[in-house]
């Protein structure tokens, strides 16, 4: 059995609450909770839903669990929903609206999270949407809440959460589409802006936009050089959806794919370009970016190039030195640096 996280331990010490015929677990983590939940409910239908492809791949190895990784939770008439509180408040509010469109009228909603995640705001966030709320338990710096007699939504349409914004860099202007939970939600960040200003001017070929967010990098390069073809990868189904919308809106030739790091990426590229992520959930996590840098070379053509932007304090140059014959620092200030192989 996998080690249990503190939110999962809190859930399991209230195992009498974890009973249902059709159970939905949203934003689950990579631990042993789903196994334990199946043991408690051997005859029940259990669906594990995540926006995160890596979590979905983890859960696929658990017997008796239906796994869904998507940008939208599908209808299921669930009578018990267990929600792990996410790091993004806009993502939470969108997920709650989605949940209220897929549950039965008798459903109970359990919400668990670490204190530092902001979970203590959940009662206010569900005000006027449930008749009963109860703080069931708190321990290990976590809190567990229960909600019942929930006001249902007749439908859920993710397009109502689209947020469009303008990007204008180096005489290239376009409209981007984002949704809650996506990096670049609502605007162009300073690091990506610097990357675009210093991106190589490749005229044709295949480009991988790694950790694509809302698809800003691919769209910028595609509008600058329309002969390019893009593969845009992200671990987030929300990001893949947003990127698809942005590419389509701007008639850029590319596709969005779900991948845990480079695991699902096939073929070789003339350019790999990225503002690599260094957070997992609410925690700092360098493993994804470091694994990406250690393995990017095998996905490049013989003359292919890697270009990234990173916070200046991150220790990426030693990895670049080890993996490539040479690399250049294209631009650097006290906040960011652009590196190219």
What are these regions (language model features)?
Residues 70-76, 263-267:
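Short amphipathic alpha-helix with an adjacent loop that forms part of the alpha/beta core around
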Residues 88, 279:
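Active-site beta-alpha loop architecture of Rossmann-like, nucleotide-cofactor-dependent enzymes
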Residues 109-131, 135-138, 283-341:
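Conserved Class I SAM-dependent methyltransferase catalytic core
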Residues 4, 140-206:
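SAM-dependent Rossmann-like transferase core, predominantly class I methyltransferases
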Residues 69-71, 257-260, 310:
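Short loop/edge segments at beta-strand edges and connector loops
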Residues 91-169:
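N-terminal auxiliary segments of SAM/dcSAM-dependent transferases
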Residues 2-63, 188-274:
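Conserved SAM/SAH cofactor-binding pocket of Class I
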Residues 78-84, 269-277, 307:
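Short SAM/SAH-binding signature in class I
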């Amino acid at each position: 059995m996998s080690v249990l996280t503190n939110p999962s331990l809190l859930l399991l010490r209230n195992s009498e609450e974890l009973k249902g015929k059709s159970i939905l677990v949203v934003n689950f983590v990579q631990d042993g909770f789903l196994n334990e939940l199946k043991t408690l409910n051997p005859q029940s239908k259990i669906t594990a839903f995540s926006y995160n492809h890596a979590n979905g791949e983890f859960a696929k190895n658990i017997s008796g669990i239906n796994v869904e990784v998507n940008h939208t939770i599908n209808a299921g008439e669930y009578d018990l929903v267990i929600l792990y509180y996410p790091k993004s408040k806009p993502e939470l509010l969108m997920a709650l609206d989605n949940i209220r469109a897929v549950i039965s009228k008798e459903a109970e909603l359990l919400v668990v999270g670490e204190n530092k995640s902001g979970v203590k705001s959940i009662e206010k966030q569900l005000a006027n949407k449930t008749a009963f709320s109860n703080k069931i338990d708190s321990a290990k710096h976590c809190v567990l809440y229960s909600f019942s007699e929930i006001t249902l939504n007749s439908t859920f349409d993710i397009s109502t959460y689209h947020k469009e914004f303008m990007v204008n860099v180096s005489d290239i202007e376009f409209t981007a589409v984002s949704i809650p939970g996506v990096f670049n939600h609502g605007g162009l960040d300073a690091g990506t802006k610097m990357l675009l200003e210093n991106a190589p001017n490749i005229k044709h070929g295949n480009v991988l936009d790694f950790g694509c967010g809302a698809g800003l990098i691919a769209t910028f390069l595609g509008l600058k050089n329309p002969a390019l073809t893009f593969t845009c990868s992200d671990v987030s189904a929300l990001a893949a959806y947003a990127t698809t919308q942005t590419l389509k809106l701007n008639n850029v030739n590319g596709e969005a794919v779900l991948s845990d790091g480079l695991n699902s990426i096939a073929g070789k590229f003339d350019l790999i370009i990225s503002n690599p992520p260094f957070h997992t959930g609410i925690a700092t996590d360098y493993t994804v970016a470091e694994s990406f840098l250690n393995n990017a070379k095998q996905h490049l053509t013989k003359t292919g190039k890697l270009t990234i932007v990173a916070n200046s304090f991150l220790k990426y140059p030693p990895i670049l030195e080890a993996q490539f014959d040479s690399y250049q620092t294209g631009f650097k200030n006290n906040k960011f640096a652009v590196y190219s192989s």
